[in-house]
Amino acid sequence: MSDWNPSLYLHFAAERSRPAVELLARVPLENIEYVADLGCGPGNSTALLNQRWPAARITGIDSSPAMIAEARSALPDCQFVEADIRNWQPEQALDLIFANASLQWLPDHYELFPHLVSLLNPQGVLAVQMPDNWLEPTHVLMREVAWEQNYPDRGRESLAGIHAYYDILSEAGCEVDIWRTTYYHQMPSHQAIIDWVTATGLRPWLQDLAESEQQLFLTRYHQMLEEQYPLQENGQILLAFPRLFIVARRTE
């Protein structure tokens, strides 16, 4: 599991794209020229940006070679760069920085977010969506299984919180619109939940394990999911998935 798997990620493409659609709908910009899609993945969010602003110069940034290759194949009219978001520098100031489900993987948001604001033109917008599920059973159980099986903590940090992000971005000279939404995804089985998180949140926990260790981890994880997520009357499972949204417009 040395690289991200675009096919596995796109298995739940509709569910993963819905927050991007809803974030984009709140971006208060019309005619813009320079756009960056940070953590563009296989290009599903970049495609939405390209549809809204077909004349804009859109650059997708991702650290995964596999994701960049998939995005280039899907969107030949857009530019894609393999780079670390923290180190990438645009050639010109940006009108929009769009980051759908990517910045949660990076540390030091107290430094990262002001840095991203500094890359914007005056009146430019930083639009961010981040999964806020660190305390959801899906992610709590990852940590519990790792502790049971004596594996080191590989999970990402929790988010800073709504009030912290408001202060960070206000102090960086932005007008801030911030909200939190919980989606309830209908899942056909507990294995489907594992398939979902294996492409993203579970990946760091598994990537350094031998195949036999991965199977032990996943077997125990499946057992614990069954305890935490009961079946509905129709046999479906409702997977709660909170997400934090931020639209910050630079005013300084």
UniProtKB/Swiss-Prot annotation:
It is an enzyme of class 2 (transferase). It catalyses: trans-aconitate + S-adenosyl-L-methionine = (E)-3-(methoxycarbonyl)pent-2-enedioate + S-adenosyl-L-homocysteine. GO terms for biological process: methylation. It is found in: Cytoplasm. Pfam families: Methyltransf_25 (PF13649). It comes from the Bacteria. GO terms for cellular component: cytoplasm. Its EC number is 2.1.1.144. One of its GO terms (molecular function) is trans-aconitate 2-methyltransferase activity. Keywords: Cytoplasm, Methyltransferase, S-adenosyl-L-methionine, Transferase. Catalyzes the S-adenosylmethionine monomethyl esterification of trans-aconitate. HAMAP family: Tran_acon_Me_trans. This is Trans-aconitate 2-methyltransferase. It comes from Escherichia coli (strain 55989 / EAEC).
